[in-house]
């Protein structure tokens, strides 16, 4: 996840675990410009308000270089044999960062796979006040198909088949064919309830769902 780091990391170093450096302790730290301080050091922007997860400014040149540069994190792991990347919370990453990351990945291995976590229809997703470019050829090869998950599970719970088909057809009609062929379809992930839990409904009389 490239939208934030841990507060207890060498980059932020809130608790001094890594000596006197880090953005929290030193304004001259090479990592200081990565973070969004409202009032240094204790008031900083963090992911969903969790102060253990300070947000980074992905457009910062030194951060981009650290992740996507010639000797950056992405290329390092590609050289180690990584065959692809799944980008968490893709809608929180700026277009330019995703495009730079894609270039780093494809430079190392043109056949490597890049998939984004997008919960809605990725063809018309809006964030950062603009329509996103996830599927226009310069960012992701595919995305997670949560639209499919919702359609199938709701159908199994009694949703009318027409509504289910409308959801599935919207993806088929909106997504480029190369993306459709490699969509990441799933009924459960680490971010959702398991399908069996959704299907079973709520526990009754203090009994479990079995």
Question: Where are the predicted features?
Answer:
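Substrate-binding/active-site clefts of carbohydrate-active enzymes
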Residues: 1-79, 107, 124
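The substrate-binding groove and active-site-proximal loops of carbohydrate-active enzymes
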Residues: 49-66, 82-92, 150-162, 195-208
């Amino acid at each position: 996840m490239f939208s934030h780091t841990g507060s207890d990391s060498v980059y932020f170093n809130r608790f001094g675990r890594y000596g006197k450096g880090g953005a929290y302790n030193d304004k001259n730290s090479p990592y200081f410009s990565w973070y969004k301080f409202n009032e240094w050091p204790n008031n900083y922007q963090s992911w969903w308000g969790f102060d253990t997860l300070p947000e980074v400014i992905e457009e910062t040149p030194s951060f981009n270089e650290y992740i996507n540069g010639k000797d950056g994190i992405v290329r390092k792991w590609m050289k180690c044999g990584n065959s692809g990347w799944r980008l968490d919370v893709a809608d929180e990453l700026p277009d330019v960062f995703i495009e730079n990351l894609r270039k780093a990945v494809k430079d190392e291995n043109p056949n490597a796979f890049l998939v984004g976590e997008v919960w809605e229809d990725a063809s018309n997703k809006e964030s950062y006040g603009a329509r996103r470019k996830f599927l226009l050829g310069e960012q992701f090869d595919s995305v997670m198909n949560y639209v499919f998950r919702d359609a199938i599970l709701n159908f199994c719970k009694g949703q009318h088949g027409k509504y289910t088909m409308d959801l599935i057809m919207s993806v088929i009609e909106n997504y480029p064919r190369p993306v459709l062929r490699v969509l990441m379809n799933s009924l459960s992930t680490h971010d959702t309830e398991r399908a069996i839990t959704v299907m079973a409904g709520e526990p009754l009389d203090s009994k479990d769902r079995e």
